């Protein structure tokens, strides 16, 4: 799969999120999952994750159509969960400012300027281009509204993972291959997922994906991170979105 390589491509993704989920200027929903594998030979505890089993990590960015627009798979399960993102090609391109992200722009019903952002859950660190929920234990009503709007838009990546889990039998038990082969199997499944959405969308997505799998260890969430002292600008941007969702951008 190809990461968007122009502002126009990113803006098309953002338009879909705005029209479908009313989260404007959103460039994609980010999430990561543990994929259970057999213990690799001579690896010690390298792939042993916080849940107590061996895994590799699948990191993915999804668009509003439930397609993967970026995947990175193969990091060992022992890596600090929130830190997996920093080892991906996606993050490398972001740090190098090579993603060709759109310049900040206005949202409907306001002349204020907002950056384009990615959205994630508690496993990720808040950043100027990465929004995450406010901590649940200390939310006021406006912050709860922000969390709801973010969760609503971010559901696309959870849904994409849910479809993978149900449609591909490989995700219903441990993958009994070495990490490199397991990563190839996982990546191939993600490519097939995208292909089927494009060519047989209605048939592929019609059947319910909310079916419990045989293994509770497959595609489990990453561990939430502790507060990483986000920058003042990142906090202000989240607060700006929060204010918008409770005022000009309020759902009617």
Residue ranges of predicted features:
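Short, polybasic Lys/Arg-rich linear motifs in disordered N-terminal/cytosolic regions
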Residues: 1-252
